[in-house]
Every structure is written in C-alpha cells, then in structure tokens.
Design a protein with these regions (language model features):
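Symmetry-related core transmembrane helices of the 12-TM Major Facilitator Superfamily/SLC fold
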Residues: 152-171, 348
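Helix-to-loop junctions at the C-terminal end of transmembrane segments
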Residues: 46-59, 145, 247-260, 341-342
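C-terminal ends and interior cores of transmembrane alpha-helices
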Residues: 68-83, 270-282
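Primarily marks hydrophobic transmembrane alpha-helices of the MFS/SLC 12-helix fold
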Residues: 60-63, 264
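Intracellular juxtamembrane helix-capping segments at the cytosolic ends
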Residues: 101-116, 299-313
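Hydrophobic core of transmembrane alpha-helices in multi-pass small-molecule transporters
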Residues: 5, 73, 85-103, 287-299
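Interfacial helix-cap and linker-helix signal at transmembrane-aqueous boundaries
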Residues: 21-22, 53-54, 143-148, 222-223, ...
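Short amphipathic helix-loop junctions that connect adjacent transmembrane helices
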Residues: 16-30, 216-232
Length: 348
C-alpha cells in the first residue's frame, strides 16, 4: 500500500501545474505532449524486460530497483525545471517512466498474490492507495500554486519523500513474491501471449487512453478552453482524482458482487457521461461534475485488468505484458491529444 501511495504523489503535484511547466520550459502545447510521452516511452522500455526480471529476483528487490531509477529520473525533472531545459526535463521523465514501470509491475504482482490468498478482490483498494497519493499530490500542487512555491523545489522535496519511505519499509516485505514457479523453471508454464492476455491488453489500452487524457490534459483544458484560473483547474483535477479514489476504495465490494466485466461496463457508461459534460463547455461547476464522472469511469480499469492478468499462469510476465498495452496507450495519447489540442482546443 505504501508503494502504491507514493508512486503517483510527485507526478500528480506536477500535473496540476502543467500550464506553468509549459511557461517555464517555453514550449507549445504540442511540444509538451511530446515531452510527456517520454515517461511512457521509458515505462514501455522497462516493461519489455521487467517480467523476467521480477521472476528472477522477486518483487521486493525489483520494487527497490524500480524506485531507485524513478528517483534518479525525477531528480533530473527537478533540475530541468530549475534551469528551464526541456531536454533535461524529457530525459528525467524518460528515466522516471522506466522506474515507474518496473515498480508498477512489482507491486501489482504483489497485489495479485494477496488477492489470491484472501480469495476476494483487493486490487481496487491498493489502487485506491495510489489515488490517495495522487489526490494528496494534486492538493499539494494546488497549495503550491497558492503560496507561489518554486516548482523545482516542490518536485525535489516530494521526490525525496516518495523515495525514502518505500525504501525504509521494504525491509518488512517478503522476498519470495513473484519468483519463478516450478512450472516456469521447468519451461511448462505456457506462452505469454495467450488470447486472454491479448484481450485484456486491448481492454486496458482503451481505458488507459481515457485515464491518461484526464491526467495529462484536464488542467490545461480547463485553463485554455474554459478560461479557468490555475486554482480552478487544480480543483478540477483534484475532483477527478478524488472520484477515482472513492470508486477504487469501494470497488472491491462492488466487483465481488457484480463481477469484473459488469462493474467495468457500468462505470464506463458513467465515464462517457462525464466526458459529454466536459465537452459541452457550459460552465466550471458542470466541468467539475464531468471530471468527477470521468474519474468514476476510468477508476477500476487498471486494477481489474491487471488483477485478471495476475490470475493467469506465469503472473509476473502476464502482468508485465498487459501493463505494456496500458503504457502503449499512455505513449500514444499525450502527443496525439497535444497536437490535436493545439489545433482545435484540448477539450474539443
């Protein structure tokens, strides 16, 4: 839970200040989209190998390695903001993405193992911890706007805190989670790209496109297309993260009652309604309501798809493969929406 909560803290504190990032780096919206994609590219690169790595060393060691790479990347992000360098910022985002990808697979394999031991859905609550961390980060980012805190200092402080806490608590984690099963050692665990894994991957691709759009562009969309002030945009992002947190916290019980598929269908319809409210561009309060429903729509996709992947044989590699589909979506989404948004407006 600690790993889940800290991995999104720093990034969400940055997302609510993306308009300022654009100004500090002196770049266009389209260029910002390309720079943001560096993180997803790094995550994709890490996911190509992380399944085998986790199976070899276990989730405890791979999680610490991932967080260490993540820390290095976000230190570079802070430096890039301090000196106004888009290149350093992008390189840091790339390494931060690699570290996040390695850590993400490690903690989701752990989460799936816990679910199987409990015999009930637990992954949504773990992803709720991630949402709590991102909500806290969004709140801290909004507070930083109010007190005019230097953005590089903000990122540096939160990066350090987010790294030291999981490193300290890692000593209490089991060291054998995620290691090769007897079937894998004997080479009888079967192929990674099964029909189920591909279908799960396609599903998570679509849903993470919607989630990535909300994380990367909601604040800028409210500023540019609603003429909202930075604080109102930050509130909109915080509402989105809050709704995701609430749904993930209670999503386990809902999933146990309705099943994964029906739960995703219901929340998905609500998410579409939220997007319609945002696209209508009526006023800021309705945009906030749309942000809330958007969060409801995307909240359970990642935990439930990865939970299903973790139920398959060879879980570390299956989770890594399905995660790769999700990060591919994050890879495609930011630049695509950035260039289209520059031409016709982010909300459009």
């Amino acid at each position: 839970l600690v790993f889940f909560s800290v991995i999104g803290l720093t990034g969400s504190s940055l997302m609510v200040r993306l308009p300022l990032v654009r100004d500090i780096l002196n770049i266009s919206t389209g260029t910002l989209g390309l720079i943001l994609v560096a993180g997803s590219a790094g995550a994709m690169g890490g996911l190509l190998y992380v399944g085998k790595f986790v199976a070899r060393v276990g989730t405890k060691r791979s999680g610490i390695v991932g967080m260490s790479i993540w820390f290095f990347g976000w230190v570079l992000v802070s430096i890039g903001l301090a000196i106004g360098s888009p290149i350093v910022f992008a390189i840091g985002n790339f390494f931060g993405g690699i570290g996040a990808g390695v850590t993400d697979v490690s903690i989701n394999v752990d989460g799936s193992a816990i679910e199987q031991r409990l015999g009930r859905a637990a992954m949504p609550k773990m992803h709720a911890a991630f949402s709590i961390g991102t909500l806290l980060g969004a709140g801290l980012g909004t507070l930083a706007i109010q007190i005019n805190l230097n953005l590089a200092v903000q990122i540096g402080i939160l990066t350090t805190i987010s790294y030291l806490i999981p490193v300290f608590i890692s000593r209490y984690l089991p060291s054998d989670n995620g290691l090769h099963s007897e079937e894998e050692k004997a080479g009888t665990a079967g192929p990674v790209f099964t029909k189920v894994v591909v279908l799960l991957g396609l599903g998570i691709f679509g849903m993470t496109l919607a989630e990535g759009a909300s994380n990367d562009w909601l604040a800028i969309g409210l500023v540019d297309d609603y003429n909202a002030d930075p604080t109102s945009a930050g509130i909109g992002f915080a509402i989105l993260v809050a709704s995701m947190t609430i749904v993930r916290f209670f999503g386990g019980s809902l999933t146990d009652r309705l099943g994964k598929a029906l739960t995703l269908r219901i929340t998905g319809v609500l998410g579409v309604l939220g997007l319609v409210l945002l696209i209508a561009r009526i006023n800021i309060p309705l945009a906030w309501a749309g942000s809330f429903l958007w969060g409801v729509g995307v909240a359970l996709a990642f935990p439930l798809f990865l939970s299903a992947a973790g139920e398959q044989p060879n879980p570390a590699r299956k989770v890594a493969t399905v995660s790769a589909f999700g990060y591919a979506s994050f890879l495609v989404g930011p630049p695509l929406l950035g260039f289209v948004g520059q031409a016709i407006g982010v909300v459009n």
